């Protein structure tokens, strides 16, 4: 009890310090917020919103059930998951953060996954998309599509290895069968609900991107690669202008893309709110994904730099 009270006190003191900083530097923070909102309007929303609508529509129309027979053997043998879980993995790899987690939560809500299966899936299905890794990081930062392809390959391999490491998660707990049987809605109803829910999710994503963009802005003044490391741990979109175009930058890019940042973690927490799914499996999975990505990048860097 005393420990909890002490932690609560420390958190309140930190928040009070942040509030004082916000008040003392309001003009600069406003400028940073404008930059973040511009980033959301110009990059985040165009990159994510169409994917969110389509993936939501696919899940509602039974894409997981359609894919299940073809993915059943692979998902069961490697990850101890049903075939429909493959849709969350594939859509997460194509659509980017936080579409994998959103698809997993929808599969759980529709009754296609048990809670234990959904927790296991959350450890490795939430990933960055190839456009960000290949175009933004590879071509934009390192001036090489080949380097971007290596970043994407490392990201995918690390995600699959993370799934293998956590395939035993929840093994000792009783598995409760899903309580809801799948019933596909009509196409107009599925489309309307997908757009509506995606708009709400997009608003939440942009809110977290903006807040963390402002919060970590002082960290950009850190020397050398420390700025990229600190910023990448908080918000992924703010990382790109800070990465050095060398082996160190490559390791940081791979590791931070695997981790996703506190902003992505908060986006995932918002998606899981009300689903009865804990955030802990996703947190452990992203920490593992980031570490494995950095290790694989260290090995690949000898051929690239």
Predicted segments, located by residue:
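Transmembrane helix-loop junctions in multi-pass membrane proteins
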Residues: 23-34, 60-64, 135-137, 145, ...
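Short amphipathic alpha-helical coupling elements at transmembrane boundaries
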Residues: 35-43, 69-80, 109, 193-200, ...
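Juxtamembrane and boundary regions of transmembrane helices in multi-pass small-molecule transporters
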Residues: 6, 109, 142-182, 271-305
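Selected transmembrane alpha-helices and immediately adjacent juxtamembrane segments
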Residues: 15-28, 33-53, 57, 152-223, ...
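Alpha-helical membrane segments and immediately flanking helix-loop junctions
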Residues: 78-142, 230-245, 250-275
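Membrane helical hairpin/interfacial module
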Residues: 46-103
């Amino acid at each position: 009890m005393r420990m909890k009270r002490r932690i609560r006190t420390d958190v309140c003191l930190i928040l009070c310090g942040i509030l004082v900083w916000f008040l003392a530097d309001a003009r600069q923070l406003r400028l940073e917020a404008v930059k973040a909102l511009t980033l959301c309007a110009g990059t985040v929303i165009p990159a994510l919103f169409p994917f969110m609508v389509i993936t939501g529509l696919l899940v509602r129309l039974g894409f997981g059930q359609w894919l299940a027979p073809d993915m059943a053997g692979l998902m069961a043998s490697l990850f101890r998951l049903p075939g429909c879980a493959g849709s969350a993995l594939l859509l997460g790899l194509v659509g980017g953060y936080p579409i994998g987690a959103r698809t997993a939560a929808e599969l759980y809500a529709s009754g296609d996954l048990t809670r234990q299966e959904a927790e296991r899936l959350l450890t490795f299905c939430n990933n960055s998309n190839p456009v960000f890794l290949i175009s933004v990081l590879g071509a934009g930062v390192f001036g090489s599509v080949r380097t971007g392809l290596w970043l994407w390959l490392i990201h995918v391999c690390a995600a699959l290895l993370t799934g293998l490491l956590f395939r035993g998660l929840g093994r000792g707990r009783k598995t409760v069968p899903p309580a809801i049987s799948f019933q596909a809605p009509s196409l107009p109803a599925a489309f309307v609900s997908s757009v509506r829910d995606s708009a709400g999710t997009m608003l939440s994503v942009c809110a977290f991107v903006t807040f963390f963009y402002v919060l970590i802005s002082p960290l950009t003044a850190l020397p050398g690669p420390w700025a990229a490391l600190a910023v990448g741990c908080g918000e992924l979109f703010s990382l790109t202008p800070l990465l050095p175009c060398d082996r160190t930058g490559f390791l940081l890019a791979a590791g931070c893309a695997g981790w996703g940042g506190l902003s992505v973690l908060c986006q995932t927490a918002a998606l899981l709110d009300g689903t009865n799914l804990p955030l802990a499996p996703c947190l452990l999975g992203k920490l593992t994904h980031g570490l494995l990505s950095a290790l694989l990048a260290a090995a690949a860097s000898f051929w690239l730099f």
